[in-house]
Design a protein with these regions (language model features):
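NAD(P)H-dependent oxidoreductase Rossmann-fold/reductase module
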Residues: 1-129
Length: 129
C-alpha cells in the first residue's frame, strides 16, 4: 500500500477509536448523549475518486455497489442523526449501505489503543474532555 493510503486508513481507525472512547466516557458520566461512527462510503465527488482518472475508473469497476454520492450519504446520515431507525446508536458503527449497525475492524475495538490515543490527544492539544 502507498504511504498516502496507509495514512488514510490509520486516520479512519483513529476516528473509530475516538468515537468508541467518547461513547464509553459519556456513558460513564451518565450524560445521556449518544455518539456513533458513520461511514459515508466511497463517493464519486471525493478527491479519492476524482484525482486520478485511471484509479477512479478501476475503483468504479471494483466497488460499483459501494459507490454513492454526497446526497445519498447525506440523507443516510440525516436519517441516523434524526433517530429514524428503530435501534439505539450509541457507540456503534454505521455504514451508508447497511440497514443497521455494522462491525468495524477487530483492531478498532482495542480499548487500550483508544484510551492511549485519547490521552495523547489531550496532551498534544492541551484540551481535556
Amino acid at each position: 500500500l502507498s504511504v498516502r493510503l496507509l495514512r488514510y486508513s490509520y486516520s479512519k481507525l483513529c476516528n473509530l477509536y475516538f468515537v468508541y472512547e467518547l461513547s464509553r466516557r459519556l456513558r460513564a458520566e451518565g450524560s445521556g448523549l449518544s455518539v456513533a461512527a458513520f461511514n459515508p462510503g466511497l463517493m464519486t465527488e471525493t478527491a479519492f475518486a476524482t484525482t486520478s482518472p485511471p484509479v477512479g475508473a478501476v475503483m468504479r469497476r471494483l466497488f460499483a455497489s459501494r459507490l454513492g454520492n454526497l446526497a445519498a450519504s447525506g440523507m443516510a446520515l440525516a436519517d441516523l442523526a434524526a433517530g429514524r431507525g428503530a435501534f439505539p446508536i450509541d457507540g456503534l458503527y454505521f455504514d451508508r449501505t447497511a440497514a443497521s449497525a455494522s462491525a468495524s475492524s477487530a483492531l478498532s475495538y482495542d480499548e487500550s489503543n483508544a484510551r492511549d490515543l485519547w490521552l495523547l490527544s489531550e496532551k498534544l492539544t492541551g484540551v481535556a474532555l
